[in-house]
Regions:
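Flavin (FAD/FMN)-binding glycine-rich loop and adjacent Rossmann-like elements that form
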Residues: 2-8, 16-19, 60, 81, ...
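Amphipathic alpha-helical scaffolding segments comprising HEAT/armadillo-like alpha-solenoid repeats
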Residues: 409-422, 438-450, 467-480, 500-512, ...
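Beta1/beta-strand and adjacent pyrophosphate-binding region of the FAD-binding site
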Residues: 17-31
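Short, hydrophobic/aromatic-rich segments at coil-to-beta transitions
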Residues: 133-138
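Conserved beta-strand elements of the Class I
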Residues: 24-26, 49, 327
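Structural detector for internal amphipathic alpha-helices that build alpha-solenoid repeat scaffolds
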Residues: 404-410, 425-439, 443, 447, ...
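Conserved N-terminal/central alpha/beta ligand/cofactor-binding core
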Residues: 2-6, 12-16, 22, 40, ...
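N-terminal Rossmann-fold NAD(P) dinucleotide-binding loop
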Residues: 34
């Protein structure tokens, strides 16, 4: 057995075995996902050890002061925990615009102890024990002493895939174009209308997951003008600042099953899901020029940011590729950067912890590898608790924070409905509906493209389908933009994937003018140059847009 550790940033491997007791499940990180996972597993009768570097359970919902929910699916163990939190709050705590963080913290710890889980706070992960690619236990530092324990399954709920990284698992971070992640916030608690309220402001970008980068970002944010105002207005009534950053995106594992926005939009669904993540593609920031084609098409060209999606998450997205004895639960599961904007909400991450714990319980009971967990037997248990919705609504239009009030959205299939949608002020659903029809959709778009009122949406639709015949009109929209920023920037997004060498001078001239279109022109030019370069080496199959069948 080998012990893998980092010493001053250098990975070391030495022979060694855990010296402490052995557990059925060790949960590393008792935040949003890990707290629910530990309680779930202990209630299943597993011997559970929970390790947390902070002084309490709950993560962003407790020590992070993020009191309200933003979407996420209903149902699951967290509903019981939230009900008990509200009951605790009613005993004399201040009313909040969500769940009182201290009350949630008390409930989580009480339920974990009641279920029999052992908890260690102030525990920093220092090493992982492996036999080949099977994780066998972990080592941690607490109160100046190194401790270790073995486990049949280790559940990584660290948010940054720390156990997975120490184990040697492959991870990714940020978007493909520049590695950029979503911005972080520093939550603050204010007293407003006789309630404690959470407030969030996008505060910056974390350069990397290192302690130095995190510390620098925290200090710069805490001492910035948003948090050291002069003077504070009476409406502010700041009660407290969170002692930790609200990080939306970091490392993500490469899983046995990787979830990609492109596949889901194309109707290529993964295996049977353990739960659904329910949210819109809540990308913070407006730098769509740097995003993937699918994100540009969905959020910028089609303007479908305000559509809530039900995204299926299978077991394979929780298993690091090629490894056993190790699961990941939290925002670091195997999704691409696009889906990371949605698969991160607190409700869904609590569901993720519950699902991972039940998968681990079955693997322990059957003494089988995690990849051989019988999902067919697992899904009824998840459905019983409400963690798995067996009949989800794939799309809803967001009109309320209460998802039950949001009306369903369905793809358009009738040509008359698609045409009417393209003529409307919100042509996005019609654009994607035509895209889903493939060649049939292209026939319709070509037919209508000669009409003045339909020329722009039909051009964009053909561009989304990957047909080069859209190029002349895309160039007109991009290089003679007039006052229509949306049409020009949308055309530039598509030229990034469809443009040719002859477009480079015009793109460079447009970028030189500056203004809002500059980043779109720059990224389009960069993409075309890269495509030309790889064409010379005959290694560009991933970069060339292909017409949709």
């Amino acid at each position: 057995m080998m012990l893998r550790q980092y010493w001053n940033g250098v990975l070391r491997e030495t022979e060694g075995s855990p010296e402490g007791p052995s557990y059925d499940l060790i949960v590393v990180g008792l935040g949003t996902a890990g707290a629910v996972a530990a309680i779930t597993a202990a209630r299943q009768g597993l011997r559970v050890l929970g390790l947390e570097q902070l002084p309490a359970m709950g993560g962003q919902g407790t020590l992070g002061y993020v009191m309200p929910y933003y979407f996420g699916g209903s149902g699951g163990l967290f509903e019981e925990l939230d009900r008990k939190t509200r009951e605790q709050t009613a005993r004399g705590f201040a009313e909040t615009n969500g769940l009182h963080p201290d009350c949630k913290l008390f409930v989580l710890e009480q339920e974990a102890r009641k279920a029999g889980a052992e908890l260690f706070f102030g525990a920093g992960l220092t090493g992982v024990y492996l036999e080949g690619k099977t994780v066998k236990g972990v080592q941690w530092l607490r109160e100046g002493r190194l401790r270790s324990a073995g486990a049949r399954v280790v559940l990584d709920c660290t948010g940054e895939a720390e156990v997975c990284v120490l184990s040697g698992c492959e991870t990714r971070r940020g978007r493909e174009s520049d590695g950029g992640c979503q911005p972080f916030s520093l939550p603050m608690t204010t007293y407003y209308q006789r309630k404690l309220c959470s407030q969030f402001v996008d505060s910056g970008f974390l350069e990397d997951p290192s302690p130095e980068s995190y510390s620098r970002a925290l200090v710069e944010t805490m001492t910035g003008p948003m948090y050291l105002r002069d003077p504070f207005e009476p409406i502010d009534r700041v009660i407290a600042y969170s002692p930790r950053l609200g990080i939306r995106e970091g490392r993500r594992i490469v899983g046995e099953t990787d979830l990609r926005l492109k596949d889901l939009l194309d109707g290529k669904l993964p295996g049977p899901p353990l739960f659904y993540a329910c949210a819109n593609l809540d990308k913070h920031g407006s730098d769509y020029a740097m995003e993937s084609l699918e994100m540009q098409e969905w959020c910028h060209i089609a303007k479908l940011w305000g559509v809530r999606l039900a995204l299926p998450v299978p077991l394979g997205a929780l298993i690091p590729k090629g490894y056993d004895g190790l699961l990941a639960a939290g925002r670091h599961l195997a999704v691409d950067h696009d889906l990371a904007t949605a698969v991160r909400m607190k409700r869904d991450m609590q569901k993720c912890g519950e699902a991972a714990a039940l998968a681990a319980a079955q693997a322990v009971a059957r003494s089988c590898p995690l990849r051989e967990v019988d999902v067919g037997r697992l899904r009824p248990k998840l459905a019983e608790s409400g963690c798995l919705d067996l009949h989800p609504v794939f799309m809803k239009r967001i009109v309320s924070r209460d998802d039950g009030e949001n009306p369903p959205v369905e793809w358009l299939t009738d040509p008359a409905d698609i045409r009417a949608g393209l003529l409307s002020e919100e042509p996005g659903l019609a654009l994607f509906s035509a895209r889903r029809l493939g060649k049939e959709g292209a026939v319709l778009l070509r037919k209508w493209m000669g009409e003045d009122a339909l020329r722009t949406p039909c051009t964009l639709g053909l561009g989304m389908l990957g047909f080069p015949e859209a190029l002349p009109e895309l160039r007109r929209l991009a290089f003679s933009p007039g006052e229509d920023f949306w049409a020009a920037s949308s055309a530039l997004c598509l030229l990034r994937w469809l443009g040719e060498k002859e477009d480079l001078p015009a793109l460079e001239a447009l970028a030189a003018k500056g203004g809002e279109l500059r980043p779109y022109a720059l990224t389009a030019a960069r993409s075309i140059r890269s495509r030309i370069s790889c064409e010379k080496t005959e290694d560009c199959h991933e970069m060339v847009a292909q017409p949709v069948d």
